[in-house]
């Protein structure tokens, strides 16, 4: 089982989480590297770094479990290079499109779930047998936390899923 990219991204996320919460001030770290209005003032690195910042231990654990579960399937299918391109480029596009929401809200977007949603969308497109289940999963993950009062970037999940689905539909990486 060669999951070179998936395992590397998981390791990087946990290393950054450790730095964020145990080495640096987590609030300042999150603001500096999360995606927020500072992006419009020149903090352009945020579009990349926000994919590696997480709001809590449960946030990173849930993201990394889902990344491992679906990343292991797609990395085997695509190979690590194409999988890496899908994850990173899909995450960047999701971040850029999510910037539109920042115009209306003062928020700080953090987490890997936008890029992970790209993977789910891609998989839903190429795997017609599991398509309905994956759509249900993304809807639950996007909206159930809101019903419990948990702040979730539901739009990033839906945007990412759509980007991934389109990438699969147009056979961008095959």
Question: For each of these PLM feature ranges, what is it?
Answer:
Residues 1-174:
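A detector for small-residue-rich transmembrane helices and their helix-helix packing motifs
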């Amino acid at each position: 089982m060669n999951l070179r990219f998936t395992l590397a991204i998981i390791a990087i996320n946990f290393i950054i989480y450790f730095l964020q919460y145990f080495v640096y001030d987590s609030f300042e770290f999150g603001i500096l590297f999360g995606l927020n209005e500072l992006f419009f003032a020149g903090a352009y690195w945020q579009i990349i770094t926000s994919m590696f910042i997480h709001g809590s231990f449960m946030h990173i654990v849930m993201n990394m479990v889902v990344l491992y579960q679906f990343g292991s399937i797609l990395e085997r299918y695509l190979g690590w290079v194409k999988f890496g391109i899908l994850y990173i480029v899909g995450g960047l596009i999701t971040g850029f499109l999510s910037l539109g929401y920042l115009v209306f809200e003062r928020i700080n977007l953090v987490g890997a779930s936008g890029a992970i949603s790209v993977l789910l969308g891609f998989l839903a497109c190429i795997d017609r047998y599991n398509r309905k289940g994956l759509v249900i999963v993304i809807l639950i993950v996007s909206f159930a936390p809101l019903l419990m009062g948990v702040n979730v970037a539901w739009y990033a999940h839906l945007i990412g899923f759509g980007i991934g689905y389109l990438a699969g539909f147009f056979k961008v990486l095959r």
